[in-house]
């Protein structure tokens, strides 16, 4: 089990934990749960011994564990249902994504436009949807240049036709980022309420060399 001390110190000063730190605490609580379950099964067969005190003090904090796991799917993935606001933002993002892609696919499917492209694909540059345009055809696709290939033969252009949609999508990305920060703040505050028990669990697991 990884040490929770650094995370607990950060919680003490009111800092927010990252998704990775919260998942690390979940791993600790999962280990505590296994030890607790083991102690219950052993209790019926073995008389009290020096480990009984450890087993009594350990607490897996299942509601906290469940809430963190409900909201955080992986270190870089927060669940849509972590909050109703996040669910709404992501629904809007999917709709906006579909609209942008539909418009850009219409451009790609136009034989004239396609002849100006290095590849008939939609790419992302700096969070903006772009088309890979042949450098010599730059004037044929009005838009904003966001990048170019190492050889300079391809320009990644955001067509003017989707600039406004891309702006709206970018705003949604920022809203998503803000909401994820709020979710992590809330989970961190919740976790801070149990800092003492988490520290106890870690100490016991370390003593047991778990």
Residue ranges of predicted features:
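Long amphipathic alpha-helical coiled-coil segments
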Residues: 46-57, 156-157, 162-167, 186-190
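SMC-family hinge/dimerization module
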Residues: 121, 125-156, 166
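Coiled-coil heptad-register positions
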Residues: 40-43, 47, 104, 108-111, ...
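Conserved amphipathic alpha-helical "coupling/scaffold" segments
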Residues: 1-85, 89, 194-197, 201-210
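Extended, Lys/Arg-enriched charged tracts that mediate electrostatic binding to polyanionic substrates
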Residues: 87-137
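Extended, charged coiled-coil "arm/hinge" scaffolds of SMC/Rad50-like chromosome-maintenance ATPases
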Residues: 60-73, 164-185
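Short hinge/gating elements
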Residues: 75-89, 148-154, 169, 184-194
């Amino acid at each position: 089990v990884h040490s929770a001390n650094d995370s607990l110190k950060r919680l003490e000063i009111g800092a927010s934990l990252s998704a990775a730190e919260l998942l690390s605490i979940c791993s600790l609580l999962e280990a505590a749960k296994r030890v607790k379950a083991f102690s219950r099964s052993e209790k019926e067969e073995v008389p009290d011994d020096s480990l009984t005190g450890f087993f009594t003090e350990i607490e897996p904090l299942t509601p906290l564990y469940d809430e963190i796991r409900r909201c955080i799917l992986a270190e870089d993935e927060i669940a849509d249902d972590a909050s109703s606001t996040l669910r709404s933002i992501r629904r809007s993002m999917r709709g906006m994504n579909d609209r942008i892609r539909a418009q850009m696919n219409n451009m790609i499917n136009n034989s004239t436009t396609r002849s100006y492209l290095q590849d008939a694909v939609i790419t992302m540059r700096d969070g903006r949807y772009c088309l890979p345009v042949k450098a010599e055809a730059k004037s044929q696709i009005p838009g904003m240049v966001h990048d170019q290939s190492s050889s300079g033969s391809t320009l990644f252009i955001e067509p003017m036709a989707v600039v406004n949609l891309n702006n709206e999508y970018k705003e949604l990305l920022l809203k998503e980022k803000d909401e994820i920060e709020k979710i992590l703040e809330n989970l961190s505050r919740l976790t801070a309420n149990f800092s003492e028990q988490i520290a106890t669990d870690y100490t016991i697991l370390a003593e047991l060399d778990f």
